[in-house]
């Protein structure tokens, strides 16, 4: 089972009609990862704290509709986090967050995850906003030490990071507990702080990460291991509606592929294996960006695509 931990929120996206300025869409990076991996046919649970308000109920209902295990969810009366989305001329999304006193940042450490957990995915605001970030950090360290395939997508929201130096140091402290690091080129450059991305990736690998997957927007994605940049996959051409949830779909698809291959160690993969994994993730992300909001594909949709 894959466990995805982190925030669940409501994206307020530009509406298609001229009557409404913004339309609500259920989302949040880790939430999207849980939906995507479950839709791809892999048993998945979501770890978070979700509001008991109407938005929160809708978030839970959508998880259940996609067969996501909700037994690790915590519920609380605090409001749901909101993210106001702006789309640029390339349909790429920028976010403004409303997080003060919201439910997801108040998650507590659930203790050891179920014994049948094989993979753990963390990232985005869940690893930034306290006190929840410390809870997720404890889960990461504990599950890594018991052999779970751990994956991190920092999904940097720079305006939510009050101390960049402290965050980069904290990020470095996670790396010995992370087997798969997936991040966009923008995030990699922000974390590298002036160094070249491949040079930074080598440092992350030296710290304990087994594979670094870099997403490059229209230029596809690639993977860097101890042997260098060993494989890549091009972007699948589609009519892009927006990019919301694209990176989350990549994260979920990579983990789903690894779990389906019964692979716990990314370092065991050959370049040809990585080519298959990256291609699978690229196809899944292409379907997501062809639809409004974060709507990742089902396994059947992916099988029929192209």
Which residues make up each language-model segment?
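Positively charged, low-complexity intrinsically disordered leader regions
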Residues: 1-17
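Ribokinase/PfkB-type carbohydrate-kinase core domain
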Residues: 1-3, 62-64, 70-71, 92-230, ...
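Conserved phosphate-binding/catalytic region of the ribokinase-like
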Residues: 3, 141-142, 193-306
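Cofactor-binding loop segments of dinucleotide-utilizing enzymes, especially the Rossmann-like FAD-
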Residues: 7, 48-52, 155
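Generic detector of well-ordered alpha-helical packing
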Residues: 8, 12, 154-156, 185, ...
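Glycine-rich phosphate/pyrophosphate-binding beta-alpha loops
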Residues: 81, 102, 124-127, 285, ...
């Amino acid at each position: 089972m894959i466990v995805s931990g982190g925030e669940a929120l409501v994206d307020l996206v530009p509406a298609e009609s001229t009557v409404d300025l913004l339309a609500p869409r259920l989302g949040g990076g880790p939430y999207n990862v849980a939906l995507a991996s479950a839709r791809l046919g892999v048993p998945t649970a979501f770890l978070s704290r979700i509001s008991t308000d109407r938005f929160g109920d809708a978030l839970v209902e959508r998880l259940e509709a996609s067969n996501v295990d909700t037994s690790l969810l915590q519920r609380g009366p605090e409001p749901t986090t909101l993210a106001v989305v702006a789309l640029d001329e390339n349909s790429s999304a920028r976010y403004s967050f409303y997080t003060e006193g919201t439910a997801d940042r108040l998650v507590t450490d659930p203790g050891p995850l179920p014994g049948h957990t094989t993979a753990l995915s963390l990232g985005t605001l869940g690893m930034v906003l306290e006190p929840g970030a410390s809870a997720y950090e404890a889960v990461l360290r504990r599950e890594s030490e018991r052999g779970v395939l751990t994956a991190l997508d920092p999904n940097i929201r720079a305006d939510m990071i009050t101390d960049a130096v402290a965050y980069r140091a904290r990020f470095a402290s996670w790396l010995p507990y992370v087997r798969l690091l997936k991040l966009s080129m923008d995030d990699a450059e922000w974390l590298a702080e002036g160094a070249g991305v491949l040079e930074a990736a080598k440092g992350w690998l030296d710290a304990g990460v087994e594979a670094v997957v870099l997403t490059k927007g229209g230029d596809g994605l690639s993977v860097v291991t101890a042997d260098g940049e060993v494989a890549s996959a091009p972007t699948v051409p589609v009519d892009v509606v927006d990019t919301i949830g694209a990176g989350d779909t990549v994260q979920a698809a990579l983990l789903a592929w690894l779990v389906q291959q019964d692979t716990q160690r990314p370092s065991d993969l050959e370049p040809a294996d990585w080519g298959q994994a990256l291609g699978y993730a690229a196809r899944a992300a292409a379907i997501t960006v062809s639809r409004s909001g974060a709507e990742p594909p089902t396994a059947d949709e992916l099988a029929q695509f192209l």
